[in-house]
């Protein structure tokens, strides 16, 4: 056997062990259809479609729908955030850029901003860690984390006779 064959054989053996460990411990891949989660009111003119909750990493994925003239109050994130604009436009009042359909936004922890959409938008967000809503003096008025999002979703479902979709939980 050549050295190259030995390397390939070793690699295949390692991958086989990885596959066995994955099959033993990993969660199954999940699929959630577009109707699997309702639009849940968040603040006036703002709705959230919760997509997944991961308490292991204190993260959550959702689609944020801001109707025309809607605003998500002044806030900061304690972990990184990634967003992909599905439709419409929005901006942070504190910055000069405007995000439009097809744009990707990444946010570093600790930045303070106020999301606003003049004409409405839908954006997919992946949030890591808590989101803190602030008053004019930078005091934390409310902290929103993965457990808050879970409660937000479950409470809305219970109040509206909607079954809680267990596929959303990691």
Q: Which positions does each model-derived feature cover?
A:
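Short, well-ordered beta-strand segments in beta-rich or mixed alpha/beta enzyme
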Residues: 63-66, 85-88, 104, 115, ...
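Glycine- and acidic-residue-biased ligand/ion/polar-headgroup-sensing regions
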Residues: 67-69, 77-94
């Amino acid at each position: 056997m050549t050295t190259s064959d030995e390397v390939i054989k070793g690699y295949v053996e390692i991958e086989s062990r990885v596959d066995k460990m994955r099959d033993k411990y990993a969660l199954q891949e999940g699929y959630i259809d577009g109707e699997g989660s309702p639009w849940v009111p968040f603040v006036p003119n703002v709705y959230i479609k919760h997509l997944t909750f991961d308490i292991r990493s204190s993260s959550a994925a959702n689609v944020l729908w801001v109707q025309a003239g809607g605003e998500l109050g002044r806030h900061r994130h304690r972990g990184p955030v990634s967003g992909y604009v599905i439709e419409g436009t929005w901006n942070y009042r504190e910055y000069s850029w405007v995000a439009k359909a097809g744009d990707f936004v990444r946010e570093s922890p600790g930045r303070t901003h106020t999301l606003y959409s003049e004409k409405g938008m839908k954006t997919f967000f992946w949030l890591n860690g808590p989101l803190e809503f602030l008053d004019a003096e930078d005091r934390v008025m409310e902290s929103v984390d993965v457990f808050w999002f879970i409660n937000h979703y479950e409470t809305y479902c219970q109040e509206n006779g909607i079954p809680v979709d267990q596929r959303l939980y990691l």
